Amino acid sequence: MRIAVWHNLPSGGGKRALFHQVKGLVERGHEVESWCPPVADRAFLPLGPLVAEHVVSLSWQEREARGRVGAVIQSYRNVVGKLRAMEEHCRRCAEEINSKGFDVLFAHSCQFFRMSAIGRFVRLPKVIYQHEPDRDLYEASPRLPWLALPSPRGSSWAPRTIGRFVRDLVRVQALRIRAREERESAAAFGQILVNSFYSRESVLRAYGLEARVCYLGVESGIFRSLGLPRDRVVVGLGAIHQSKGIETAIQAVASIPEPQRPALVWIGNFAVAAYLRDLNQQADSLRVKFVSRVGISDDDLVESLNRAAVMVYTSRLEPFGLAPLEANLCETPVVAIAEGGVRETIVDGLNGILVPDRNPVLIGKALAKIVDNPAWGRRLGEQARAQVIEKWGWPRSIERLEGYLMEEIEKSGSRDNR
């Protein structure tokens, strides 16, 4: 197959998945070229050494608020302007792709709007690997964005109350436009592939569209056991961002009696500075040794996973989560909250422990059970690596992906021949 790829991904799990998918397709003899905007991360696991990579301009200008009316509609105009700029970028990419005789478009997510608009403009069979819908629109994090403002204390017709109402009305209209555009872009693809059955349900809830599960793989050559001694350390892995629920991990470690309390090391590809400050203050107040490490190399990551006694996984409704499987390949068991896609990767008692809810005391007891029983932790870790190698290898994942792409080409041919 001749495959055109489009993405607008930051560093992290999504880009890691795309890299291995492109690598696997090339190794299976397919011809692949990639398109992306300049804001996509091209330094982390770059595609350039694997395939021809085309960087197509994307530009928009944040409008300055001028006057009282301008201040009210600024956020709306910025959202619409950014959508139109991304649409124009996708149109230019599509013109290049349409002229090159590709068999299929394989798109990935957009870091700004999650669903790419490129499917609207490419005249090819088209498949998107959608890591998740725009969760800010559909989930309470911590509050649904659509909820009405609190009832005013005074008169509903007071100028200040009317001003708040109008500003909120404009804000919500911008959200509605984002949701409309996301759904229309999703409907333009012949197939939506997702990383878990949980994600399939999320797509169905958000868009009312069917999606198919194409499980990802994990690189067992990178993530491996080094045979190092295990320290009394709990490790967490993921961006230092509110969605990762790191405050729960700190509370869980704090629930372990202080004489036996392990340290908590958190490794992230980036950190939200204000959130990290809050975490450090929380850890200090709870007497938890908390160490954050940001942007470390894969070698350092693998060593850290090998030295930890256990991984704690507290992400909120994570669609899939590569981190637990990466830890498992390093023979590190995982304690995770039983929500989101992690229920499809962690088998309770086989490669870790699933905790039924976000209760820090329950999570802490599960962590202590592994930290205080090194022999059992080793047994879980050995089982974990064997299970990941058997079920979560990249060759099986690429074979599934290849089948879905070929199926879409065949379906499109059948439609064209009617």
Predicted regions and their residues:
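A conserved mid-protein helix/loop that constitutes part of the nucleotide-sugar donor-binding site
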Residues: 15-20, 232, 241-255, 274-277, ...
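Membrane-proximal helix-turn-helix segments that form the acceptor-binding/catalytic region
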Residues: 134, 146-192
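Acidic anion/phosphate-binding donor-loop and adjacent secondary structure
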Residues: 139, 201-206, 212-213, 217-232
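Nucleotide-activated donor-binding/catalytic signature segment of Leloir-type glycosyltransferases, i.e.
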Residues: 268, 276-302
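Aromatic "clamp/platform" in nucleotide-sugar-dependent glycosyltransferases that forms part
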Residues: 316
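Short hydrophobic beta-strand element within catalytic cores of glycosyltransferases
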Residues: 333-336, 346
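Conserved acidic donor-binding segment of nucleotide-sugar-dependent glycosyltransferases
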Residues: 348-349, 353-360, 369-374
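A short, well-ordered alpha-helix in the C-terminal region of glycosyltransferases
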Residues: 362, 369, 376-391, 397-403
